[in-house]
């Protein structure tokens, strides 16, 4: 059913145009609503090294609105993605007019968010997103949220592969902090 629901809004082609030298994409780890399934950007190059340089897709904690700029309550999460995007643009030497940003940017990887699916977005059902990449594709805020002992219940990304990666890389640190508290 989600295929039919999304048919009208699906990207025709997710491969970037050859005239695009660099593309950045902030992706929500915790989005579970099928109507907001992720469309990853595909590089136009066939060379692996060039592909990694053309398209940078980084996964952030939170749902679709949390990463893309949802409610004020979740702005700490979206501010993290916004700051990352601004840093990418500035690193390319492009001018960035920050006067268009209507609030101070205060990233907070520990900000709470509601990951439940409500009407009408629950009509198509829920499922974790398909993850492509490795731990290097996770923004630092994911790791910081994972090890933050003040989040109750402890952060558990919606994508099982990411949970396993974090457990392998940071599990000992998380357990060590819990024991020392």
For the regions a language model picked out, list residue spans one by one.
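Active-site- or binding-pocket-proximal scaffold segments within functional domains
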Residues: 1-181
């Amino acid at each position: 059913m989600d295929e039919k629901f999304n048919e009208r809004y699906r990207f025709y082609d997710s491969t970037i145009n050859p005239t695009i030298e660099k593309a950045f994409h902030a992706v929500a780890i915790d989005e579970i609503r099928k109507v907001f399934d992720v469309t990853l950007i595909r590089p136009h190059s066939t060379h692996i090294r060039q592909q990694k340089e053309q398209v940078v897709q980084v996964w952030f904690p939170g749902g679709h609105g949390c990463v893309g700029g949802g409610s004020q309550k979740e702005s700490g999460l979206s501010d993290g993605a916004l700051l990352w995007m601004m840093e990418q643009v500035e690193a390319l030497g492009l001018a960035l007019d920050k006067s268009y940003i209507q609030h101070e940017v205060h990233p907070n990887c520990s900000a709470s968010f509601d990951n439940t699916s409500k009407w009408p977005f629950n009509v198509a059902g829920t499922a974790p997103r398909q993850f492509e990449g490795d731990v290097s594709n996770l923004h630092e805020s994911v790791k910081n949220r994972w090890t933050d002992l003040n989040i109750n219940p402890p952060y558990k990304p919606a994508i099982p592969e990411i949970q396993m990666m974090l457990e392998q890389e940071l599990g000992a640190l998380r357990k060590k902090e819990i024991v020392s508290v």
